[in-house]
């Protein structure tokens, strides 16, 4: 197997926006918290054969740093504070935090260290893994093929939406972590800018800066997971996470992720003060229609007009699924659709990787993501899963992976 030695990544900002948003909050409030995160391949692919090439790319990441132009760009955004940006300017990836092994064909990756540093590994490392694997499996794929497939998808969308008022349809690129390559992501987002008036932003800060579009993203599961050990009371951990986010971002970045435990458990914690303070909610697992109906009903119970709030759908979407959801909800609530893999790795003959890196420990103790889809549950410690389910008054469910 040919080892590609040139760096895949060229910018510290080639990552999802919410990583920097969370990193700033961790820098300000949880500077000394330590965590561990691990790689999971939800499919049955044996990716261990690529361990050496991935490790080489990880080693090259230590040379990434914030450029003067990037520093100036981040400084222009209203929610970043100068102390954090000054610290980020000096940040360098530490490859010693990352253990990469070929375990009998299986790819094992574990990342350990201070949360403020570990937090930045996930997205670029997943993008590296995806690009390494795809360029070996599909070496002849071109950007033209990706654009041709996008054109087909857009034409299908236009045909299917001919009788729909799309004035409130909004699309965001969430495609960094499982993209075929960085080049293809940039090509796709550029094509959408030119041909799809409903694109409102990208989660990738590097692309947002260079292409002049809005960066989008708030927080991820790890924000809620870590609070399971940071909060003195497990049953209060989700509320603690929501409260600390508002402390860091009282007027910006107000979309809350609902499925670290489950939507039902989330809504029990999401009382009137939270529902008023947050601008909306993000769906990432479970049936999206059921979830949206629950969200709207919750706002109505609290006497909040759902049309004053936004629901973000981001779970395995394509344009057809987004259109179905838009038709169902567009008269009742504001909508945004975050699409990832189906934008940046939608190429005939290419099977996208179903890969994640998730927090598994905080301060040496287990954390869990349960979610509204049992297949997405992540925790190494069954006893802790039982504790969590008991604390949040959840029924028993299938064993975690």
Curated annotation (Swiss-Prot):
HAMAP family, per this entry? NAPRTase
Q: Into which family does the record put it?
A: Belongs to the NAPRTase family.
Which reaction(s) does the protein catalyse, per the Swiss-Prot or TrEMBL entry?
nicotinate + 5-phospho-alpha-D-ribose 1-diphosphate + ATP + H2O = nicotinate beta-D-ribonucleotide + ADP + phosphate + diphosphate
What are the EC numbers?
6.3.4.21
List Phosphohistidine occurrences by residue: 221
**Is the keyword Phosphoprotein assigned to this protein?**
yes
Q: Which PANTHER family match?
A: NICOTINATE PHOSPHORIBOSYLTRANSFERASE
Q: Name one GO biological process term.
A: NAD biosynthetic process via the salvage pathway
Which modifications occur after translation, per UniProt?
Answer: Transiently phosphorylated on a His residue during the reaction cycle. Phosphorylation strongly increases the affinity for substrates and increases the rate of nicotinate D-ribonucleotide production. Dephosphorylation regenerates the low-affinity form of the enzyme, leading to product release.
State the superkingdom. Bacteria
Alphabetized InterPro entries for the sequence: N/Namide_PRibTrfase, NAPRTase_N, Nic_PRibTrfase, Nic_PRibTrfase-Fam, Nicotinate_pribotase-like_C
Which residues are the signal sequence here? none
Name under which the protein is recorded: Nicotinate phosphoribosyltransferase
Gene Ontology MF, one = nicotinate phosphoribosyltransferase activity
Which enzyme class?
A: ligase
| Pathway assigned to this chain's UniProt record | Cofactor biosynthesis; NAD(+) biosynthesis; nicotinate D-ribonucleotide from nicotinate: step 1/1
Gene Ontology cellular-component annotations: cytosol
- What the protein does? Catalyzes the synthesis of beta-nicotinate D-ribonucleotide from nicotinate and 5-phospho-D-ribose 1-phosphate at the expense of ATP.
The record's listing under SUPFAM superfamilies reads: Nicotinate/Quinolinate PRTase C-terminal domain-like, Nicotinate/Quinolinate PRTase N-terminal domain-like
